[in-house]
């Protein structure tokens, strides 16, 4: 977000920086500028490189092109725009202690900042709903949320985020009326984000707090369902291992299918944990800033400008974290290694999401859906049924399954969803 203009000091400026006529303070000021420039440059490089890698991996490898990963792409795009159009100009503003890009770009820069944060948290809300549908209604999931519908949802997220961010700023609904703010608005070299109290509170609620409440509520429901499923897996595994060996042999499909289903569900829950880490990291990085933003809107001089800007940059750094979190996924790790030419030999068939069998035939591995624990006591179904002897069904799953059908073909699902 833009910097509040209630003070004239700058982020982490060293003591004595206001006495340029003294050699020691001037040297300290130069050292501070160089040090901060290096740190900020590394942040920008990490954001851009990491998110370009994520977007390229999903675009190149068909195995990663799942509904959930479409939303991950949207999130990576928001982070990439943050790294290209927001963070560098924010760094320049701090280091040069003035705005050098004109009043039009000042408003545009602030609008893009709000856009990226709003689009990110709205996308996280959509991912939470996506996972809720996948884990509670796996058999309806394919119809409820197709790839085309996912594209429409992503478009709506960006349109709504654009209206929330650009409209109030371009219409100047945010502007404060006190003298310091008016002087800043009239000066092109000033890009401090002075806001009136209604805008500060309303924008924080609409852009952050409301989506945050929705995200936390939906994802808490997802984890409640996941916990119940894990408990059923534990109970069912105990019953399975207690069965007589002869009974297991009489039912050739129940044993392996049961193990595959349990493995599938457990890895689905691991994927949920990864998405939970992404959402938790975003919340931890941005929540302090938006708390301060509300306080700043109510009492202008209560929060030092250094604290405001520092918390803003903590939020910026979040854009570099997500690519690191995606490395929890084996498929993302392999894709990153392939793109960086670190592990080419084992990824020959990776790009099209296919796996070759001993007969030289290739089977396509489908995309993800959720894990399901049915209530039927007679079948004790844990997830989707394993492929029958007719061949590999077009199963959907988030994790690899090393099973084969009766003809020796690989019926494994993939781990493309984190």
From Swiss-Prot:
Pfam families: 7tm_1 (PF00001)
Annotated TM spans: 35-58, 72-95, 107-129, 151-174, 197-220, 275-298, 306-329
Residue positions of covalent lipid attachment, annotated as S-palmitoyl cysteine: 265, 341
Cytoplasmic-side segments: 59-71, 130-150, 221-274, 330-418
Membrane topology: Multi-pass membrane protein
Domain of life, per lineage: Eukaryota
S-S bonds: 106-191, 184-190
Protein's GO biological process: adenylate cyclase-activating adrenergic receptor signaling pathway; negative regulation of G protein-coupled receptor signaling pathway; norepinephrine-epinephrine-mediated vasodilation involved in regulation of systemic arterial blood pressure; positive regulation of autophagosome maturation; positive regulation of lipophagy; positive regulation of MAPK cascade; receptor-mediated endocytosis; regulation of smooth muscle contraction
Post-translational modification (record): Palmitoylated; may reduce accessibility of Ser-345 and Ser-346 by anchoring Cys-341 to the plasma membrane. Agonist stimulation promotes depalmitoylation and further allows Ser-345 and Ser-346 phosphorylation. Phosphorylated by PKA and BARK upon agonist stimulation, which mediates homologous desensitization of the receptor. PKA-mediated phosphorylation seems to facilitate phosphorylation by BARK.
Main subcellular location: membrane
Keyword Chloroplast part of the UniProt annotation: no
Residue list for modification Phosphotyrosine: 141
InterPro entries the record matches: ADR_fam, ADRB2_rcpt, GPCR_Rhodpsn, GPCR_Rhodpsn_7TM
Gene Ontology MF term list: beta2-adrenergic receptor activity; norepinephrine binding; protein homodimerization activity
Location of region: Disordered: 381-418
Residues that bear 4-hydroxyproline: 387, 400
Motif (PDZ-binding): 415-418
Function of the molecule: Beta-adrenergic receptors mediate the catecholamine-induced activation of adenylate cyclase through the action of G proteins. The beta-2-adrenergic receptor binds epinephrine with an approximately 30-fold greater affinity than it does norepinephrine.
Family assignment from sequence similarity: Belongs to the G-protein coupled receptor 1 family. Adrenergic receptor subfamily. ADRB2 sub-subfamily.
Subunit structure: Binds NHERF1 and GPRASP1. Interacts with ARRB1 and ARRB2. Interacts with SRC. Interacts with USP20 and USP33. Interacts with VHL; the interaction, which is increased on hydroxylation of ADRB2, ubiquitinates ADRB2 leading to its degradation. Interacts with EGLN3; the interaction hydroxylates ADRB2 facilitating VHL-E3 ligase-mediated ubiquitination. Interacts (via PDZ-binding motif) with SNX27 (via PDZ domain); the interaction is required when endocytosed to prevent degradation in lysosomes and promote recycling to the plasma membrane. Interacts with CNIH4. Interacts with ARRDC3.
Protein name as it appears in the record: Beta-2 adrenergic receptor
């Amino acid at each position: 977000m833009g910097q509040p203009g209630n003070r004239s000091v700058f982020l982490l400026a060293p003591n004595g920086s206001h006495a340029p006529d003294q050699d020691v303070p001037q040297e300290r000021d130069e050292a501070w500028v160089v040090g901060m420039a290096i740190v900020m440059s590394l942040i920008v490089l990490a954001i851009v490189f990491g998110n370009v890698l994520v977007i390229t991996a999903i675009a190149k490898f068909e195995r990663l092109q799942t509904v959930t990963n479409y939303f991950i792409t949207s999130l990576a795009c928001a982070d990439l725009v943050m790294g290209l159009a927001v963070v560098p100009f924010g760094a320049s503003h701090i280091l040069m202690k003035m705005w050098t890009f004109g009043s039009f770009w000042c408003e545009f820069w602030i609008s893009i900042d709000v856009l990226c944060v709003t689009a990110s948290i709205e996308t996280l809300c959509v991912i939470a709903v996506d996972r809720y549908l996948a884990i509670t209604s796996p058999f309806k999931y394919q119809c409820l949320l197709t790839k085309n519908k996912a594209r429409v949802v992503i478009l709506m997220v960006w349109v709504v985020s654009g209206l929330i961010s650009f409209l109030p700023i371009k219409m100047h609904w945010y502007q404060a009326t006190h003298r310091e703010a008016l002087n800043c608005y009239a000066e092109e070299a000033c890009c401090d984000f002075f806001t009136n109290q209604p805008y500060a509170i309303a924008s924080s609620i609409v852009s952050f707090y409301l989506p945050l409440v929705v995200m936390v509520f939906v994802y808490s429901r997802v984890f409640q369902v996941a916990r119940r499923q894990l408990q059923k897996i534990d109970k069912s595994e105990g019953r399975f291992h207690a069965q007589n060996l002869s009974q297991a042999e009489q039912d050739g499909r129940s044993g392996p299918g049961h193990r595959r289903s349990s493995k599938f569900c457990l890895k689905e829950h691991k994927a949920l944990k990864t998405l939970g880490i992404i959402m938790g990291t975003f919340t931890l990085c941005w929540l302090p800033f938006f708390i301060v933003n509300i306080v700043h809107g109510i009492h202008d001089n209560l929060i030092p400008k250094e604290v405001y800007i520092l918390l803003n940059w903590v939020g910026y750094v979040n854009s570099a974290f997500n690519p690191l979190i995606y490395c929890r996924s084996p498929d993302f790790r392999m894709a990153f290694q392939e793109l960086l030419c670190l592990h080419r030999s084992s990824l020959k068939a990776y790009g099209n999401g296919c796996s070759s069998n001993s007969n030289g035939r290739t089977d396509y591995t489908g995309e993800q859906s959720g894990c399901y624990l049915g209530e039927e006591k007679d079948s004790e179904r844990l997830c989707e049924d394993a492929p029958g002897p007719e061949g590999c069904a077009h199963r959907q799953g988030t994790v690899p399954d090393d099973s084969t059908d009766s003809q020796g073909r690989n019926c494994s699902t993939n781990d493309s969803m984190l």
